[in-house]
Amino acid sequence: MEKKWKYCAVYYIIQIHFVKGVWEKTVNTEENVYATLGSDVNLTCQTQTVGFFVQMQWSKVTNKIDLIAVYHPQYGFYCAYGRPCESLVTFTETPENGSKWTLHLRNMSCSVSGRYECMLVLYPEGIQTKIYNLLIQTHVTADEWNSNHTIEIEINQTLEIPCFQNSSSKISSEFTYAWSVENSSTDSWVLLSKGIKEDNGTQETLISQNHLISNSTLLKDRVKLGTDYRLHLSPVQIFDDGRKFSCHIRVGPNKILRSSTTVKVFAKPEIPVIVENNSTDVLVERRFTCLLKNVFPKANITWFIDGSFLHDEKEGIYITNEERKGKDGFLELKSVLTRVHSNKPAQSDNLTIWCMALSPVPGNKVWNISSEKITFLLGSEISSTDPPLSVTESTLDTQPSPASSVSPARYPATSSVTLVDVSALRPNTTPQPSNSSMTTRGFNYPWTSSGTDTKKSVSRIPSETYSSSPSGAGSTLHDNVFTSTARAFSEVPTTANGSTKTNHVHITGIVVNKPKDGMSWPVIVAALLFCCMILFGLGVRKWCQYQKEIMERPPPFKPPPPPIKYTCIQEPNESDLPYHEMETL
């Protein structure tokens, strides 16, 4: 009985100290919070205790105290009016025996404004209370700072987009940030990440990109939030071209920083492939095709004959351009050059033709890639191809244009692919229509004349547009639909004084000469095939006759079998023993 009274006395003493410690100290603080209509607000109160937590609650103070939510370490959460507590309040334990009690208010309206009280019951500190005056701003104009940027990057690389864009001096130690991406199909924005930067340096991510764009196949598993609130996109794809990412920073109730970044994607194309199409009569018409694959954005294909850029509209040469867009976003360009034979005398017996692709790359430059060269003789079927040109990257220096009385001669056989700075070049051709896209280029054309041995180096800066033209038919393909544009060009240009040009390109390959009797190669091939068929038929007939002779021959002679030898069995005599007696022996 005495032990029971001792335990009761100790229990009551502890309860008295507990109640005394709880009501010993009360801390009250008050803070004003400003919010705009339709925004989300998070009210947070945090503290650290020496002992343990007893209870935490949120209430709205009007004429009376309306309970919103209660948290007890043993019994858990309770929210009034049957509202779900998962989206309304959160309790987070912080290091060093601390805690954070947050109330989430979504889609702010005038009815939500008022006084909100956060009460923390601690032992042995006592009761701590913090009151928020939530005010709704309806006609307050925020001080916005907007900045727009463009980042150029090649495909399959990692894109890093800073949020502040050199404006860190305008940002305080505590702010709210959010990353979003523009949805071009619906003309809306999709939230990627949202968080809060506290005064003590901690960062809290409220919404991560995994929860909002998990169903998006274009940005899934490619967006991450790095240090200094930078957004990382890896790897970059063709479909990211033109995509706009925006970072919103709210420093205070009246100050918003907004930075938008537009992505521009580039892809280096493959080396263009030039082939000569089969024609029924090469003496009347010759056709060449230049194919460029895996290019983005759109590139330009230009043609050269004996080093002369085809830009003058004359009779004899026609060019048709086609564009195709694949499912992967890459473009495939095709240019067909048709040369019609002219009765005018030519300055040279052979011509060398090739194509060049001019594709834009980051840094306001152009990537020039030349195909192999095809050389053919005029008035015959002889044609050959040179090996592909070497590929180099360099800066192109421009020189004054030559006089109008001198036209450029053949391109050297050891030309190179050059990276041209578009910003340093100026076109010297006629202006293009307003709806055409212009690409300027610079080339060096060495030429020689029969009257002098001096070699001059001249720079031409031709400019060509393939998007639209008053004299040609436009061509664009989307979703595997082909359209084309056609342009007419001239024969090979010559010098004004009629000087003879020398071609230093060596002809290699297989040469097929035309027979003297005028018989074309299809007739020869048909005759050879006919002879082969006759020989094959004769062979089959001979084999059938041989098989028939074998079947009609008489069977071979077989000798008769040898005679059968018969033996005589003698009957037993009376003197012989019977069988059963012989058996007993």
Curated annotation (Swiss-Prot):
Membrane-topology descriptor: Single-pass type I membrane protein
Presence of the UniProt keyword DNA-binding in the record: no
Keyword Transmembrane helix applies: yes
Tissue: Expressed on normal T-cell lines and clones, and some transformed T-cells, but no other cultured cell lines tested. It is expressed at very low levels on activated B-cells.
Gene3D superfamilies in the record: Immunoglobulins
Subcellular location: Membrane
Transmembrane stretches, start-end: 520-540
Annotated stretches, region: Disordered: 385-475
Disulfide bond sites: C45-C118, C163-C247, C290-C355
SMART domains given in the database record: IG
Main location, first listed in the record: membrane
Assembly: Homodimer; disulfide-linked. Interacts with PVR.
Domain Ig-like C2-type: 269-375
Signal peptide bounds: 1-21
Biased composition (Polar residues): 385-418, 426-452, 460-475
Organism: Homo sapiens
Residue positions the entry lists as glycosylated: 42, 97, 107, 148, 156, 166, 200, 215, 277-278, 300, 350, 368, 435, 497
Name the UniProt record assigns to this protein: T-cell surface protein tactile
